């Protein structure tokens, strides 16, 4: 990976559903990053001069793939083909981790390809991050700096918990509660399936196998509300790896409204602990209700990509989490 420090980082996005499209639009006004590559399951698009986001979105929504866009290519091995063609400094893996091994499999593709640079994901499940941990040495040897768990939660709220923990001698509990409002669940099909997988009676395989009609029927039964408790969320292992607390002291739950863009409740993290004076107290960090899921996931992801690029230039390769590194603001 070679990039003049004064030139914008050349960025790719893998996955072009609701999250990937939001990420592309977020990058459009940025000066420090330039979107040059996108891929979906049926095709990819590479343009060293910068991708026309409107054209890419139109091709995806109207023709089913960015491969139909100007300069696009149809491919059933789009990730592999894109890695081989494009000069990209870092990729945001805006991919659904369905099945639960998918992100690790994609990571192995990058390792095997010989590509060097920065990868960032917004993974949710603890078990998915554990799979990446087993690839830590392989990533380092391949010359890849991988930033995992860098969305909203895990990610932004995990980092907030790591900072807030500094006030305490010991941490008693980290409680993350989120509210997500989505006007149209079909724009986030994979994300909703990942959330359904956390519900009682469901798992990743069952949620992945659901048809759109079955998902719609479930949402009809719940009036569009997904109430989630005691989720398997990688905030726990990330804070444990950072030495802040044991994973059993971290709880994550929330409410997703799939029929209303307004958040059903405020997203926040509450950190409770004991100070060195023996006082029990709590810090609470709350996200603004007007900030969308896309803003709170994609913004931190690119902030961590920028931070990861800094690590990469210093020769630091391998796996890092949102609790290990502060994100950098992307101008």
From Swiss-Prot:
Phenotype reported upon loss of the gene: Loss of biotin biosynthesis.
Pfam families on file: ELFV_dehydrog (PF00208)
E.C. code: 2.6.1.121
MF annotations from Gene Ontology: NAD binding; NADP binding; oxidoreductase activity; transaminase activity
Catalytic residues, chain numbering: 124 (nucleophile), 194 (proton acceptor), 198 (proton donor and proton acceptor)
Pathway where this protein functions: Cofactor biosynthesis; biotin biosynthesis
Keyword Transferase: yes
Coiled coil: none
Catalyzed reaction equations: (8S)-8-amino-7-oxononanoate + L-lysyl-[protein] + CO2 = (S)-2-amino-6-oxohexanoyl-[protein] + (7R,8S)-8-amino-7-(carboxyamino)nonanoate + 2 H(+); (8S)-8-amino-7-oxononanoate + L-lysyl-[protein] + NADPH + H(+) = N(6)-[(2S,3R)-2-amino-8-carboxyoctan-3-yl]-L-lysyl-[protein] + NADP(+) + H2O; N(6)-[(2S,3R)-2-amino-8-carboxyoctan-3-yl]-L-lysyl-[protein] + CO2 + NADP(+) + H2O = (S)-2-amino-6-oxohexanoyl-[protein] + (7R,8S)-8-amino-7-(carboxyamino)nonanoate + NADPH + 3 H(+); (8S)-8-amino-7-oxononanoate + L-lysyl-[protein] + NADH + H(+) = N(6)-[(2S,3R)-2-amino-8-carboxyoctan-3-yl]-L-lysyl-[protein] + NAD(+) + H2O
Allysine modified-residue sites: 124
Consequence recorded when altering residue 124 to A/R: No longer forms a BioU-DAN conjugate
Keywords for the protein's UniProt record, in alphabetical order: Aminotransferase, Biotin biosynthesis, NAD, NADP, Nucleotide-binding, Transferase
Domain of life where this protein originates: Bacteria
Gene3D superfamilies per UniProt: NAD(P)-binding Rossmann-like Domain
Enzyme class: transferase
Keyword Nucleotide-binding set for record: yes
GO BP of this protein: amino acid metabolic process; biotin biosynthetic process
Binding site for NAD(+): 15-19, 60, 190-191
Domain statement: Has 2 domains; discontinuous domain I (residues 1-149 and 291-331) forms a nucleotide-binding domain while domain II (residues 150-290) binds substrate.
Protein family (similarity comment): Belongs to the BioU family.
Note: In canonical biotin synthesis a pimeloyl-conjugate is transformed into biotin by the subsequent action of BioF, BioA, BioD and BioB. This enzyme replaces BioA and performs the first half-reaction of BioD. In Synechocystis BioD acts on the product of this enzyme.
Role description: A 'suicide' enzyme that participates in biotin synthesis. Catalyzes the formation of (S)-8-amino-7-oxononanoate (DAN-carbamic acid) from (7R,8S)-8-amino-7-(carboxyamino)nonanoate (DAN), a function equivalent to the cannonical BioA reaction and the first half-reaction of BioD. The cellular requirement for biotin is thought be low enough that this single turnover enzyme supplies a sufficient amount of the cofactor.
Quaternary structure annotation from Swiss-Prot or TrEMBL: Monomer.
Name of the featured protein: (S)-8-amino-7-oxononanoate synthase BioU
Organism: Synechocystis sp. (strain ATCC 27184 / PCC 6803 / Kazusa)
Lineage: Bacteria, Bacillati, Cyanobacteriota, Cyanophyceae, Synechococcales
């Amino acid at each position: 990976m070679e990039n003049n420090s004064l030139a914008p980082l050349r960025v790719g996005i893998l996955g072009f559903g609701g999250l990937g499209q939001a990420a592309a639009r977020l990058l459009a006004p940025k000066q420090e990053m330039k979107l040059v590559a996108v891929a979906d399951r049926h095709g990819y698009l590479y343009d060293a001069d910068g991708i026309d986001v409107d054209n890419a979105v139109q091709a995806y929504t109207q023709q089913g793939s960015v491969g139909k866009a100007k300069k696009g290519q149809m491919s059933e091995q789009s990730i592999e083909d894109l890695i081989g063609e494009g000069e990209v400094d870092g990729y945001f893996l805006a991919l659904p981790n369905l099945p639960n091994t998918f992100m690790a499999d994609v990571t192995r593709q990058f390792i095997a390809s010989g590509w060097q640079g920065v990868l960032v994901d917004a993974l949710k499940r603890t078990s998915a991050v554990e799979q990446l941990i087993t690839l830590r040495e392989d990533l380092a040897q391949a010359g890849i700096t991988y930033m995992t768990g860098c969305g909203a939660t895990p990610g932004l709220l995990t980092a907030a918990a790591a900072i807030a923990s500094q006030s305490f001698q010991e941490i008693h509990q980290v409680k993350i509660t989120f509210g997500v409002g989505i006007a149209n669940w079909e724009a986030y099909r994979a994300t909703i399936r990942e959330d359904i997988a956390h519900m009682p009676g469901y798992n990743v395989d069952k949620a992945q196998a659901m048809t759109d009609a079955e998902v719609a029927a479930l949402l009809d039964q719940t009036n569009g509300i997904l109430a989630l408790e005691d989720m398997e969320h990688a905030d726990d292992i990330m804070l444990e790896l950072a030495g802040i607390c044991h994973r059993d002291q971290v709880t994550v739950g929330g409410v997703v409204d799939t029929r209303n863009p307004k958040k059903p409740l405020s997203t926040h993290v509450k950190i409770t602990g004991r100070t060195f004076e023996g006082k029990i107290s709590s810090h609470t960090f709350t996200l603004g209700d007007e900030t969308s899921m896309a803003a709170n996931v994609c913004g931190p992801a690119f902030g961590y990509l920028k931070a990861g690029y800094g690590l990469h230039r210093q020769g630091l390769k391998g796996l890092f989490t949102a609790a290990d590194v502060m994100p950098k603001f992307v101008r």
